[in-house]
């Protein structure tokens, strides 16, 4: 399930952030899933959100309409997004991307004030990953320059 989605267009340096409404009530979540979700919720409240969850695919298609490739962090997110959109989806960890804590740009402001104290934010993470990817691509270009 996607609660927060951030998109960075590296060509235009445009960022977008979406917080999705809950797809169903908390009471409908099985007990085990509820405990797991509470442990990894990144401090997003289940009731937060302004975009209908049913709009997730529409948002992805709109945001990726001009993209050649989409980069996700980790195999689980990569598989999930691959199942929703007909684009090349690349797991950025396969390119050697380090953990978030090693690349986080702390100057980026987040939508939720509580995130600013916890350094967990989809927007900050996406922007940090995009900056790492740009650096990585440039490094590869210069590493292969003829001498």
Predicted features by range, described:
Residues 3-75:
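Conserved non-catalytic scaffold segment of RNase H-like nuclease domains
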Residues 1-4, 126:
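A broad structural signal for short, well-ordered beta-strand segments within beta-sheet-rich domains
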Residues 12-16, 22-28, 62-147:
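Metal-dependent phosphoesterase core characteristic of DEDDh/y 3'-5' exonuclease domains
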């Amino acid at each position: 399930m996607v609660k927060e989605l951030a998109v960075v267009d590296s060509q235009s340096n445009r960022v977008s952030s979406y917080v999705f409404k809950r797809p169903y009530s908390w009471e409908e979540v099985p007990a085990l899933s509820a405990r797991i979700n509470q442990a990894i919720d990144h401090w997003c409240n289940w009731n937060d959100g302004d975009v209908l969850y049913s709009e997730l695919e529409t948002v992805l298609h709109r945001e990726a309409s001009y993209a050649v490739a989409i980069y996700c962090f980790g195999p689980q997110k990569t598989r999930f997004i691959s199942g929703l959109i007909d684009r090349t989806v690349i797991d950025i960890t396969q390119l050697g991307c380090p953990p978030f804590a090693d690349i986080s740009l702390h100057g980026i402001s987040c939508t939720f004030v509580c995130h600013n104290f916890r350094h967990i934010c989809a927007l900050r993470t996406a922007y940090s990953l995009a900056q790492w990817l740009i650096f990585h691509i440039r490094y590869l270009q210069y590493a292969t320059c003829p001498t």
